[in-house]
Amino acid sequence: MSQQALADKPLLSRGMIAVLCAQFFSAFGDNALLFATLALIKQQLYPDWSQPILQMAFVATYIVLAPFVGQFADSFAKGRVMMVANGLKLAGALVICFGFNPFLGYSLVGVGAAAYSPAKYGILGEITSGEQLVKANGMMEASTIAAILLGSVAGGVLADWHLGVALGVCALVYAIAVVANMFIPKLAAARSGSSWRPRAMTGSFFTACLVLWRDGEARFSLAGTSLFWGAGVTLRFLLVLWVPIALGITDNATPTLLNAMVAIGIVVGAGAAARFVTLKTVKRCLPAGVLIGVAVAIFALQHSMPMAYLLLIIIGILGGFFVVPLNALLQERGKNSVGAGNAIAVQNLGENTAMLLMLGLFSVVVKLGVPVIAVGVGFGVIFALAIALLWGWQWRQQRQKTAE
């Protein structure tokens, strides 16, 4: 479809609505299953440091499959790719439901998620264009975060009530996501005819990595989103251990409610980014990134539920405002160079490598007995410094470009 035809289409087209609905149910299942599975391993008396390992098993699938999923997304109609990926998530949820190893089942969900991600973001560049792409990303993030909000709370609350029901609901939601994918219009493959030999695919993927990392704006986006999502997933597990220490509450529901506050904030921040940031003004998001780290450090010192809620909402608002423009920038740069699916696969490699490293470090410091409040403060300070360095680096690159 031509760029002009895309620009003339309303943002909330039939295809866009179908994509948003499918994404909502898929993300709902992901987040409900995470907290239900955390409750399961807690019930089975696994040690505290094993909780991040669950997410690391999930994340590792993204890294292993990174060379292949971008081409998979670009070689077939992306709506059908999303449907197959949700089917794999359903299979993983059933593995956990029927009492098999939860780490194995959650890894299978990770395989589905790895295949799903390039397709869900890549399809936005095929059904929207230009400045509508930033708005579409804002809507996608809002749909995702609404699902995180409801899914996280549902997973924790249902697990406190009946763990078997919680796991069954997760499987049902994935089944609904599979059905929702059937309503996405079938679009032509973005890049059909590529080689399916593993060696050629791996070479093609790392070529795409080099192309994007040599592009200044794409590199800036990749670094920013990797830091953000690495920190975001670590914060989720920090909350699980922080709540009993700082608030004296030991149920499964409270950490999910606190995670939901971040989700509410990200919805607001994503909306603000769609309203106030364009592809030409992406750098406006950087101060929000620094403030995320400051807010996390302050949050870790709290012992009051109302202040915890307020600070987590603020962290979410800053996060949404920070990450949405960076996603849109990468999709635009990727679509014009290596393909949107490959660009998102490269992004996933960066983000999940950051997650794996941060979760691994978090697991180590917990195992070593470092107080969780100290971990939270240190985590916030390091994140703020990392984004400040990214900001300074980008400013320097811009000055050099202007001088030339």
UniProtKB/Swiss-Prot annotation:
InterPro entries for this protein: LysoPLipid__transptr_LplT (IPR023727), MFS (IPR011701), MFS_trans_sf (IPR036259)
Q: What is its main location?
A: membrane
Membrane-spanning residues where?
A: 16-36, 53-73, 91-111, 139-159, 164-184, 195-213, 227-247, 253-273, 285-305, 310-330, 350-370, 372-392
Q: Which Gene Ontology terms cover its molecular function? A: lysophospholipid:sodium symporter activity
Q: How does it sit in the membrane?
A: Multi-pass membrane protein
What organism, scientifically named, is this protein from? Answer: Yersinia enterocolitica serotype O:8 / biotype 1B (strain NCTC 13174 / 8081)
Could you tell me the gene encoding this protein? lplT
Cite the Pfam families for this sequence.
MFS_1
Compartment annotation? Cell inner membrane
| Protein name (database record) | Lysophospholipid transporter LplT
Coiled coil (UniProt feature):
none
Family (UniProt): Belongs to the major facilitator superfamily. LplT (TC 2.A.1.42) family.
Main function: Catalyzes the facilitated diffusion of 2-acyl-glycero-3-phosphoethanolamine (2-acyl-GPE) into the cell.
Superkingdom per UniProt:
Bacteria
For this UniProt record, the keywords arranged alphabetically read as follows: Cell inner membrane, Cell membrane, Lipid transport, Membrane, Transmembrane, Transmembrane helix, Transport
What are the annotated GO cellular component locations? plasma membrane
